[in-house]
Amino acid sequence: MDNYTYSELLKSLQNKCDNIALIIKPEKIKQELERIEKEQEDPNFWQDVLKARDTNKEKVRLNRLLETYQKTKNSLDESVELFELAQNDNDEVTLSLLYEEAPTLEHSVQKVEIEIMLSGENDASNAIITIQPGAGGTESQDWASILYRMYLRWAERRGFKSEILDYQDGEEAGIKGVAFIIKGENAYGYLKNENGVHRLVRISPFDANAKRHTSFASVQISPELDDDIDIEIDEKDVRYDYYRASGAGGQHVNKTESAVRITHFPTGIVVQCQNDRSQHKNKASALKMLKSKLYELELEKQQSSAKNEEKSEIGWGHQIRSYVLAPYQQVKDARSNIAYSNVEAILDGDIDAILEGVLIAKA
C-alpha cells in the first residue's frame, strides 16, 4: 500500500461513516435512550412484562449500535489525523503501521454497516433451519449432513446454542432431513439469506471409480416467533400424525408415539418434531415451526408483490451457492458474486464473510 491508496481508502471510509450517520442519526439515538431510561424509572414500567421486555431489547440494540458507531468513528478520525501528521513528518514507521491496520479499520466500518442491515423486524430472533437433501440418494444425504454440521459449527464459533427439532438418518450415510433452532442474537438476521439450494461438486467418497458428482440440498430459514405474535391456523386446514421417534434425539424409539408431524393443506408445508419424549412438547414445537414458516411465506409474498417478481425467483427453490471441491476448490455465492478459496474453513463454519457479503450485496 502507498500514500495515495491509503488516502483514497480513508476518503471512502469517511463517506461511508457520513452515510451511516445520516441513516442512524446518533443524536436521535441518544435522545431515545434517555427517553427509555426515564420510562424505566417509572415504578409501573414492569407491570406490562412483554412491553418492558421489548423496550429493554430495543435499549440494548440502540446502545450497541451507538457504541459500535462511535468507536469506529473515533478510530477513523484518529487514523486520518495520524496519517496527516506522518505525511508532514515523513514518518515511515507510523505510515507503515497505519497501512497494516487498514484492513481492521475497513472491517470495523463494515461491521457498523452490518449492524444497520440487521435492524429488520425479526433479525434479532432465533433462526429455525430445515435442511433437505435433493435427488441423488446417499450423495445428497451426505451433503445435507455436511451443511448441517457447517451451521452448527458457525453457531459454536459465535457462542450460540442449537436445539434439534427433528432428525432423520440417511440410509447409508448423511441425513434424510433435519430441523433445528440456532439461538443467539441476530441469528435469523445473519442466516435469513441462506434460503435456497446449495450445490456441491466433489469426487464422491461413495463411488469406487472416484468420479466427480454434483449434489444438491435445500436450506429453509424462518424466524422463531415470539409467543405474542399471533398467526391464525384453522384446525380444518391441518392434519396431525403421531409416530415413534427415530434417529438423533429419538433414543426412546419404539416405546411411545411421541413424534409429531403436521401437514398444512393450503400451503403444502409439512413440519415434524421428535426431539422431546413428550408428545405435547413436540406438538407445541411443531406448531411453532409451522407458524414461523407461514410467517416467512407471507413475507416472501409481500416482497414478491412489491418487486413484481414471481415467487419462484425468490422462493426456496433457487440455487444460491456452489461449493466446488474438485477439480479446484472454491465456494461462490450467486448473490454477492464473490468467490472464496478457504473451502475447508467454510465447511467448518467459517461463513461470516459469506453471510456479510450477501447482506451488503442485497442492501
Swiss-Prot record:
Its main location: cytoplasm. Pfam families: PCRF, RF-1. SUPFAM superfamilies: Release factor (SSF75620). It is found in: Cytoplasm. The keyword Cytoplasm applies. The keyword Cytoplasm applies. One of its GO terms (cellular component) is cytoplasm. The modification N5-methylglutamine is found at Q251. InterPro entries: PCRF, Pep_chain_release_fac_I, Pep_chain_release_fac_I_sf, PrfB. It comes from the Bacteria. Keywords: Cytoplasm, Methylation, Protein biosynthesis. Belongs to the prokaryotic/mitochondrial release factor family. NCBIfam families: prfB. HAMAP family: Rel_fac_2 (MF_00094). This is Peptide chain release factor 2. It comes from Helicobacter pylori (strain HPAG1).
